């Protein structure tokens, strides 16, 4: 049984065959899926999916590139959604300096990142963290969050092995997806080799980040076995052990998911 901790089935790339795709991946052994909001609109669609399918759970939040969606009114709406029993995390939230270089934009990202972390603390929910080209600021903010007993996962991890181990020391999990199968993913392979298996979560970020041999195509959760096989190869263990351990990790973090 595979636990997919980061999907975007609300994405428009699934609009023509969304239900068929979700049913297919479930039949292929993906027993639990967290669909992750990235904007107010996608969070609404995420919640609709979690109402429709008993194996899909919702993460509610606004991605740093979509913080124009956030004001006190929409933030209050987000707070209300954290009370729903099928909301299992706040996310995806964080910092993305890849596109946004302006200091005032980055400051606004940090402001709403911290506000959404406070939301997670209020609701006793874990967080799903997006961080791109913002390693130091993210680490500083998450170090403070750990002091408030906020738990979570660093999604689609892309920084150094050393920083990953620092996150683990703070109590966070590391999300690993299709990138680990890429030929140029030496840094991530090294990170996985150094991480304890009991701190890794499986994810796709679908429809993005399809693993080899499907790189460049629309991704979905049925591709997770490629990620499992690669992690098993790196760690010198069996795919079954990777599947079992990462599933247990996900249940340990996302406590509102029915086990």
What are these model-predicted stretches?
Residues 1-259:
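Mid-domain alpha/beta scaffold segments of enzyme catalytic cores
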